From Swiss-Prot:
<dbReference type="GO" id="GO:0009086">
    <property type="term" value="P:methionine biosynthetic process"/>
</dbReference>
<protein>
    <recommendedName>
        <fullName>Bifunctional protein FolD</fullName>
        <ecNumber>1.5.1.5</ecNumber>
        <ecNumber>3.5.4.9</ecNumber>
    </recommendedName>
</protein>
<dbReference type="GO" id="GO:0035999">
    <property type="term" value="P:tetrahydrofolate interconversion"/>
</dbReference>
<dbReference type="GO" id="GO:0000105">
    <property type="term" value="P:L-histidine biosynthetic process"/>
</dbReference>
<dbReference type="GO" id="GO:0004488">
    <property type="term" value="F:methylenetetrahydrofolate dehydrogenase (NADP+) activity"/>
</dbReference>
<comment type="similarity">
    <text>Belongs to the tetrahydrofolate dehydrogenase/cyclohydrolase family.</text>
</comment>
<dbReference type="InterPro" id="IPR046346">
    <property type="entry name" value="Aminoacid_DH-like_N_sf"/>
</dbReference>
<dbReference type="GO" id="GO:0005829">
    <property type="term" value="C:cytosol"/>
</dbReference>
<keyword id="KW-0368">Histidine biosynthesis</keyword>
<comment type="pathway">
    <text>One-carbon metabolism; tetrahydrofolate interconversion.</text>
</comment>
<keyword id="KW-0554">One-carbon metabolism</keyword>
<keyword id="KW-0521">NADP</keyword>
<dbReference type="GO" id="GO:0004477">
    <property type="term" value="F:methenyltetrahydrofolate cyclohydrolase activity"/>
</dbReference>
<dbReference type="Pfam" id="PF00763">
    <property type="entry name" value="THF_DHG_CYH"/>
</dbReference>
<keyword id="KW-0378">Hydrolase</keyword>
<comment type="subunit">
    <text>Homodimer.</text>
</comment>
<dbReference type="GO" id="GO:0006164">
    <property type="term" value="P:purine nucleotide biosynthetic process"/>
</dbReference>
Length: 283
């Protein structure tokens, strides 16, 4: 079965817009997010454009801050401090990667917890690992969990293999699965005999960024396969999974594009709504 992220993303956006419209009707205020882009990374620009269009569609105001790669860390930290103190800014979005002279961890950790719409602040990730209700999930892992829920896939007692151990996807999704009583194995580029691990997975999640890394012989019959990878090959987008062949064995599989990627912005919008309500004291 194809796991359609586009349809679910549309449904989520409709619900968010309805809630934003209702809050505006009652309180006469709209959410405001500040988005910061340093440098001219093409993938970041594409993601930013997708964000801004969604903000406009849902009635979310946006303050855009674009800087050259030469910007200093001190300047960026000073800007974030001002945005933290601005009561009319509900969320702060840092588009990664940042140039080498800027410590990304330091910058992300400088964002006020209530305004951390990306969920990358160390405090936020700590709350996630504790399964504390106060955490904000990073958007892509949240999208994966939304898809799993939509297709009624029970994680309890399942063997889940996550290929990719980044702070953005791999580690947070592993924590979310653990919180749902799944059994998680995390693999990375140093993992020996990767296929031996993946063939045991009831649910296989790949978030590496290597086209067709996951082949048919690496997948168990009837497994759920979730492809987070986005790779441009000969002008076309491909995932980490050899989709055409793996889909023959998988009970559920996400396409690229149209799977997890479609949900990343939708879940970011959900995080913005959450920060908006918390920042403005709206119950």
């Amino acid at each position: 079965m194809l796991m359609d992220g586009k349809e679910l993303a549309r449904d989520i956006k409709v619900k968010i817009k309805a809630e934003i419209d209702n809050i505006k009707k009652i309180h006469n205020i709209n959410p405001m997010v500040a988005t910061i882009l340093v440098g001219d990374d093409p993938a970041s620009q594409v993601y930013l454009n997708s964000q801004v269009k969604s903000y406009q569609d849902l009635g979310i105001g946006v303050q855009k801050y674009f800087f050259s790669e030469e910007i200093s860390e001190a300047y960026l930290l000073n800007l974030i401090d001002k945005l933290n103190k601005d009561t009319e800014v509900d969320g702060i979005m840092i588009n990664l990667p940042l140039p080498p002279q800027i410590n990304a961890t330091k910058v992300l950790n400088s964002i006020k917890l209530i305004k951390d719409v990306d969920g990358f602040k160390a405090e936020n990730l700590g709350l996630l690992f504790q399964n504390n209700e106060g955490f904000t999930s990073p958007s892509t892992p949240a999208g994966i969990m939304a898809l799993i829920e939509k297709y009624n896939i029970d994680l309890e007692g399942k063997d889940v293999v996550v290929v990719g151990s980044s702070n953005i996807v791999g580690k947070p999704i592993a924590a979310l699965i653990l919180n749902s009583r799944g059994t998680v194995t995390i693999c990375n580029i140093y993992t020996k005999n990767l296929a031996e691990k993946t063939k045991n997975a009831d649910i296989l999640i790949s978030a590496v960024g290597k086209a067709k890394l996951i082949t048919e012989d690496m997948v168990k019959e009837g497994a759920v396969v979730i492809d987070v990878g986005i790779n441009r090959v000969n002008g076309k987008l491909e995932g980490d999974v050899d989709f055409e062949n793996v889909q023959k064995k998988a009970s559920h599989i996400t396409p690229v594009p149209g799977g997890v990627g479609a949900l990343t912005v939708a879940m970011l919008l959900s995080n913005i709504l959450k920060s908006f309500k918390a920042n403005r004291g709206i119950i």
